[in-house]
Structure formats: structure tokens, C-alpha cells
Amino acid sequence: MISVNDFRTGLTIEVDGDIWRVMDFQHVKPGKGAAFVRSKLRNLRTGAIQEKTFRAGEKVNRAQIDTRKMQYLYANGDQHVFMDMETYEQIELPAKQIEHELKFLKENMEVYIMMYQGETIGVELPNTVELKVVETEPGIKGDTASGGSKPAKLETGLVVQVPFFVNEGDTLIINTADGTYVSRA
């Protein structure tokens, strides 16, 4: 059991018979009434996102998640195939279950597959990934003084805001938690 006061981003919990990952949380102490924790949770089985409010001090079960190192191989229609790095066993996950992670996955990338009581429930990405820019407007000399940004389409189809000096063909480091530009690789 874990207190909701100890919530951290990325924590996996069991609520109402489902496994949830804490995406965001906020401790709220209103002037009148009891404190509470407002949280944004993602269902690891279905991918659904739900906002849930807990009373301060309320206890929830912490889900024990096992991870296995696997390699992303390819997409087979709506299914995505991963291979265990030790046993060479292959598993398929539906696109709906790993919708958020698909924006960062490229072939032969090593990831961790999350398992709960023998059931595959999702993909755990590294904190950052390197992706190549396939489409962006060219930077114009003198643009950088304003410190603005422009959209860039990456090899996985993800579109991120990048500084003006980024060009097509550049490899970028992208934060997988929020999909933002970190730096050039």
C-alpha cells in the first residue's frame, strides 16, 4: 500500500481492479475543507486516460510490474512485434495499447516490456530517444535572434517544435514523457 501523498510521475498503482500509471498529480490544499490529490492516470491495459481525485492520506495498492528487455521489430498491420533479447521469443501488442509510445518507436530500438501477473500491459521507453528530422522549413539567416521555434516532422511521424537552426536530416534528442525537443544529437 502506498499513500496518495507519495505519488510520483511514472508510479504504477492498482485502482478499481485496473493497473494505472500516474502521468501527473497535484496536491491541493483548499482554504476550506480537507486537502486532496488530483491525478491524471493512464490505464496500462487500454491506454485510456482518466482524471481521478483522492483524499489526502488515502492508500492505494502499488502494482508490481515486471519488465523484460525487448527489441521493437516491425508493425504487422495493427499489431506491433517485439522480440525478447534473451529467448528470441516474439510478442505482439495492439497499436491501441501502445498509442503514446508509437510516436517514439523505431525499428530495432531496445525497450522494456511491462508485465503484470504474466500479462503484457505496455512498453516502457527510455527517457529520451534520438529521431531524425524528415521535414521542416529551412532556417533563414537572422531568424535565431528572436529565439522562436518552428514545427519539424520526425521519422516516426511525430511533429515537435524546434529552434530555427534545426534542418532536415538533423538527428534530435526528444523527451519521451512529453514529446518535446531537448537538443541536437
From Swiss-Prot:
SMART domains, sorted: EFP, Elong-fact-P_C
InterPro entries attached to this UniProt entry: Elong-fact-P_C (IPR015365), NA-bd_OB-fold (IPR012340), Rib_uL2_dom2 (IPR014722), Transl_elong_fac_P/YeiP (IPR020599), Transl_elong_KOW-like (IPR013185), Transl_elong_P/YeiP_cen (IPR001059), Transl_elong_P/YeiP_CS (IPR013852), Transl_elongation_fac_P (IPR011768)
Keyword Protein biosynthesis: yes
Subcellular location: Cytoplasm
Gene3D superfamilies xrefs: 2.30.30.30, Nucleic acid-binding proteins (2.40.50.140)
Pathway membership, UniProt: Protein biosynthesis; polypeptide chain elongation
Keywords associated with the record: Cytoplasm, Elongation factor, Protein biosynthesis
Biological process, per Gene Ontology: peptide biosynthetic process
Gene Ontology cellular component list: cytoplasm
Molecular function GO labels: translation elongation factor activity
PANTHER family for this protein: ELONGATION FACTOR P (PTHR30053), ELONGATION FACTOR P (EF-P) FAMILY PROTEIN (PTHR30053:SF12)
Role this protein plays: Involved in peptide bond synthesis. Stimulates efficient translation and peptide-bond synthesis on native or reconstituted 70S ribosomes in vitro. Probably functions indirectly by altering the affinity of the ribosome for aminoacyl-tRNA, thus increasing their reactivity as acceptors for peptidyl transferase.
Family stated for the protein in its record: Belongs to the elongation factor P family.
The name this protein goes by in its record: Elongation factor P
Upper classification of the organism: Bacteria, Bacillati, Bacillota, Bacilli, Bacillales
Gene name in the database record: efp
